[in-house]
Amino acid sequence: ASGGNNAERTLIVTSYAASAVDAAINDVVIPSDKNIAISIHYYAPWNFADGQTTSFTENDKIELSNKFSQLKSMFADKGTPVIIGEFGCVKAASDTLRGDYFEYYISEAKKFGIKCFVWDNGTLSGESSFGIFDRDAYKWTETLLKGIIDGAE
């Protein structure tokens, strides 16, 4: 079933619980292999991502930049690609601000060579509303989609 290509496939590893906290990423030991990548979940800044605040500040941007720089120096600069396997923010702030957040997050990660996957749990309302695509109406939340696309360009 693998087609005999396992020796050339990329193996994605994570820190403990895919955490981006220093204690978790400092303990990651990457084997000497060109086909390894690391995936981290990084919901940051946490107060915005979790909906405890509805502002996305310059200090929040600095926090993201610092973490991306750290991940680059710890892994990418040593030959291990970095993937943000999950990130996002709940629907506490306006969709316009959330779109701006997605654009900044993705474009800033891109500067450090980091690829990102936005988390969409299919929920468009309530405390854990990470949804960006309405699965009943088959419609995107346009401002969020625009932020994602603009950040990736």
Stretch-by-stretch model annotation:
Residues 1-53, 69-89, 111-112:
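Active-site region of glycoside hydrolase catalytic domains
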Residues 6-7, 62, 96, 107:
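Residue-level detector of secondary-structure boundary/capping sites
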Residues 12, 56-59, 91-92, 137-140:
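N-terminal substrate-binding region of glycoside hydrolase catalytic domains
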Residues 16-22, 62, 90-99, 124-125:
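Acidic-and-aromatic substrate-binding clefts and catalytic sites of carbohydrate-active enzymes
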Residues 47-64, 135:
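Acidic/histidine-rich helix-loop elements
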Residues 64-72, 101-106:
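Short, acidic/polar
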Residues 94-153:
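Aromatic-rich peripheral "rim/lid" segments of glycoside hydrolase catalytic domains that contact
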